[in-house]
Amino acid sequence: MNIKIPRIVIGGTGSGVGKTTIALALTQILRKKGLKVATFKCGPDYLDPTYHSRASQKICHNLDGWLMGKESVLNTFYQACHNVDIVIIEGMMGLFDGHSPNSEIGSTAEIAKWLASPVLVVLDTRGMARTVSAILKGLKIFDPDLNLAGAFANFTGSPSHIQLLKDASTEVPILGGLCKHSEQTFPERHLGLYSASEENVSEEKFNFWGEEGEKSLEVNSILEIANSAPEISIPVSNINTTLKRCKIGIAMDSAFHFYYEENLMRLRQAGAELVFFSPLSDSKLTDVDGLYFGGGYPEVFAPTLSKNKSLLNYIQDLSYKNIPIYAECGGLMYLSKGIKLVEGEFFPMLGLISATSIMEKKLKALGYVEVTTKKETIFGEVGLRFRGHQFRYSDLELDESNPIELVYNLRKRKSDQVSEEGYSKNSILASYIHAHWASNPNLAEGFVQSCLRK
């Protein structure tokens, strides 16, 4: 199927240059003009999409070349672009950074070329003048197949600084930028930005950057570039959503909200009705056939989670009845015996996994992984392969008197070394890995089948 939709990719020269802020400002400006905006985030990040979803009032989807592959990226793009006027895709890291230092695999540039999208690159221009032209020329000639159509100058000292940079750039037009306003930056914690749904992420900050963008971004030129994006061919899969066959409870609140939208979509297509609940505030669930605990910040909300005894007891009872339970990262911590914070305080949790979650000051794991199941799980048969990502500051202290069965063979993206992970007991499967189910469509169907057999 061929489609033509206005679109831009907002890339950067690296992390921290202000890609998210530019994307949010543009989204708000375009919505104010009456346009329906769809947003995407390149890479495995969970937090930036919460900001794009809030700004666009539509669910933001991840696009990751290594996790998903080209066909799934194109299909996800197509399915999320119905009834929208324009698409904004925020990149990750630097424009050409990805799977390898020697290729574009997994990079923003790869996604931009798959989608035949013009790219607008964001630069940190503090203390910079004519050098901006050299940087942009280098980016442009580095990959002639990439349509580098414009740039944004961020962290400028004044409007006159932005004008100086525009005058200096001869290779790529600078379409405005945002001045330094450190008091209006979005708050961060150990895993990155706070989720946009949390109370300390104010509407004032969103409005501020939208208003700043209106003053300094060349919106008409940006729209012209977006409209120049050519028609692309989408190899649309024949996806038939199965009639609802089971109900799966999805933990969704401030403590648990790291989910790839693709995973939830595939569960629905496999015939699951998704029932959202809050481990922070709900006391029980009604008639569910399975449970899915995503990642998040259980360590931040550990006191509240631990005090909700009625739900803890209810989930324990469901587990004893062999209800399939799948948990990732923060979800794994919730299933453990408890969470020990960096300060030493301990908060009991579900106790379904015989291990204690220990929070550390230093990062414990970060990066892409490939998983092969070495035993049958609630996902299905032995030998299932899929890809995922991990980013954590906690580790598990296993209870040696009650050993856990390890059911994953784990290979890091840049290594041939295989380690064991994936904690399984009865109908429970828990892991630190955030699996992207587009890497193996059988995962959602396998989980639904396990829920039907409960």
Swiss-Prot record:
Pathway: Cofactor biosynthesis; adenosylcobalamin biosynthesis; cob(II)yrinate a,c-diamide from sirohydrochlorin (anaerobic route): step 10/10. It catalyses: cob(II)yrinate + 2 L-glutamine + 2 ATP + 2 H2O = cob(II)yrinate a,c diamide + 2 L-glutamate + 2 ADP + 2 phosphate + 2 H(+). Gene3D superfamilies: 3.40.50.880, P-loop containing nucleotide triphosphate hydrolases (3.40.50.300). InterPro entries: CbiA/CobB_synth, Class_I_gatase-like, CobQ/CobB/MinD/ParA_Nub-bd_dom, GATase_3, P-loop_NTPase. Its cofactor is Mg(2+). Keywords: ATP-binding, Cobalamin biosynthesis, Glutamine amidotransferase, Ligase, Magnesium, Nucleotide-binding. The active site is at residue 329. GO terms for molecular function: ATP binding; cobyrinic acid a,c-diamide synthase activity. The record marks 434 as: Increases nucleophilicity of active site Cys. GO terms for biological process: cobalamin biosynthetic process. Catalyzes the ATP-dependent amidation of the two carboxylate groups at positions a and c of cobyrinate, using either L-glutamine or ammonia as the nitrogen source. Belongs to the CobB/CbiA family. Comprises of two domains. The C-terminal domain contains the binding site for glutamine and catalyzes the hydrolysis of this substrate to glutamate and ammonia. The N-terminal domain is anticipated to bind ATP and cobyrinate and catalyzes the ultimate synthesis of the diamide product. The ammonia produced via the glutaminase domain is probably translocated to the adjacent domain via a molecular tunnel, where it reacts with an activated intermediate. PANTHER family: COBYRINATE A,C-DIAMIDE SYNTHASE (PTHR43873:SF1). This is Cobyrinate a,c-diamide synthase. The gene is cbiA.
